[in-house]
A protein has these predicted regions:
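Bacterial N-terminal signal peptides
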Residues: 11-21
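Bacterial N-terminal signal peptides that target proteins for export
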Residues: 2-12
Length: 284
């Protein structure tokens, strides 16, 4: 088959492997990419074809989005399809995040929709965090929206504004989960930026005490403690017992307080085995 001839269509062995969409690749697609697509269609196993497609997607989406998208939507390996759809949304979102998100929201299966929506939402830049959060709330209520919200909070949403959004999240079960994640991220980010951790902890406490819902308040304190616990394991470990002791005193739930105390002490003893003390003892 002469790939250089005008108007050529990639047929190769595509139809045998459920890759019929490849036969619609535009003639102006670079020859090297078309050759790679033919080579992909000739690979002997589905796993090999899936891996090859994943590697080709950045180039393919950039020059022939419609055919790439159609191929991924109809990919015969159902277990790999969410991953491929997520990658397609990611590469598409680099140049048009809203178009990628609209496409992702229209996918048929829930696991595929989630993978693509998650990737598209992640394409919003840090400066557009408020816009990204607004897009999350435009998603239909349910598992996909909740999981995407958790991912956003974990990845790049920090500080009081993000915390307030988490506290106001329109699901009473999910909101405390988001609050705990956002205050954890708040502490971790403060550490990376060499901020005063005691002062940052006080900002979290100040905000948390404004919350009327005790579940959200305790989640805020617990998240900050999760952050301090994680920092103990850092290469440049945090040794700030004062905010840890203070935050523990604010938690009324005895079971939660004991759990956090145990986790922090265990982390401390692993990191500092020669330290006879621990960071959770409240000194009077």
């Amino acid at each position: 088959m002469n790939l250089e001839s005008k108007g050529v269509r990639l047929v190769a062995l595509a139809s045998l492997f459920g890759l019929a969409a490849i036969s619609s690749v535009r003639a102006d697609v670079p020859t090297d990419l078309r050759l790679d697509l033919v080579a992909m269609s000739r690979l002997p196993t589905q796993a090999q074809r899936t891996s090859a497609l994943s590697n080709l997607l950045p180039r393919w989406v950039a020059v022939d989005l419609d055919t790439a998208r159609l191929t991924v939507e109809n990919w015969p390996d159902e277990s790999a399809r969410p991953m491929l759809l997520g990658e397609t949304a990611w590469y598409w979102g680099e140049r048009d995040v809203r178009a990628a998100l609209d496409w992702a929201k229209g996918l048929r299966l829930e696991n595929e929709r989630y993978a693509a929506v998650r990737s598209a939402i992640r394409r919003f830049p840090y400066e557009a965090a408020r816009e990204a959060r607004a897009e999350v709330l435009r998603l239909p209520a349910g598992k996909i929206r909740d999981k995407v919200a958790e991912q956003l909070v974990e990845e790049f949403h920090r500080g009081r504004e993000a915390a307030e959004w988490c506290a106001a999240y329109p699901d009473a079960i999910v909101a405390p989960i988001l609050v705990r994640k956002v205050t954890r991220s708040w502490i971790l980010t403060a550490f990376v930026k060499d901020a005063n951790l005691n002062a940052e902890s006080e900002l979290i406490e100040e905000w948390a005490f404004e919350l009327s819902d005790i579940r959200l308040r305790e989640a805020a304190f617990a998240g900050a403690l999760d952050g301090f616990c994680r920092l103990i394991y850092y290469p440049r470990p945090c040794r700030e017992p004062q905010p840890i002791r203070r935050l523990l005193r604010y938690i009324d739930d005895g079971v939660l307080r004991e759990q956090l105390t145990s986790e922090i002490n265990e982390a401390w003893q692993k990191k500092f085995p020669d330290d006879v003390g621990n960071p959770t003892t409240v000194r009077k």
